[in-house]
Amino acid sequence: MKRPRIHREGRGLIVSTVLLLFMINVPMYIYFPHWAFAVTLALTALLLVFVTYFFRNPVRVLEIDDPNFLIAPADGRVVVVEPTEEHEYFHEKKLQVSIFMSPFNVHANWYPIEGTVLVSEHQKGHHKGAWLPKSSTENERSLVVIETPSKVQIAVRQIAGAMARRIVTYAKPGHVAHRNTHLGFIKLGSRVDMYLPLDTEMFVQVGEHVKGNETILGRLADVKAPKPAKAAKEKAPKTKKNKEKKV
């Protein structure tokens, strides 16, 4: 049986939780009735299981040949698939795809496509419910823009929720985005938005549950190579014929 993997973002918190529970349970065992100690031990054990489960880090490797496929960057439920105005980077209409992550989902975030990271910015904000539409623009968030080898740009926005108080983004400008690699991590319930070209072909609908680095969300349209400019036909300059004067 394989030992469960724990994400590096949770190791310090798990150690702190174990120490805290030890400090709670030892006095309960010494100074309180056995039934009170048993209840406390059971409750604190459940808390430790939840914290450990929350920071689980499953191994997911997806092998696909088509570089235009978009892979889910996070676990959760699709809550938005619609054209919308993106005001922070593109300043134009894009196809927004949003995934809501509950506290029971894996909270690691993956790169949805391969390319080069152009932008990685963190913005402070509120901590409203991540399921609310305004959370995309008002909550604490991090924006990552990736340019594919075919020069198509997409944006991934990590959004903090009412419980999620910390966003971790590993992507930095100039980094190469590889499939099967973590883009970042969000602690507790949160949301991930993607902004895609309007002609992106989508394979999922609102209400569907997806798995990060497993579910194929859609496919970017093929980018046609620009046609070579037609050479302008050179026209011979017109010359005026000198009329011979009659003598």
Residue ranges and their predicted role:
Residues 1-247:
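Contiguous, well-folded functional domains in the mature portion of proteins
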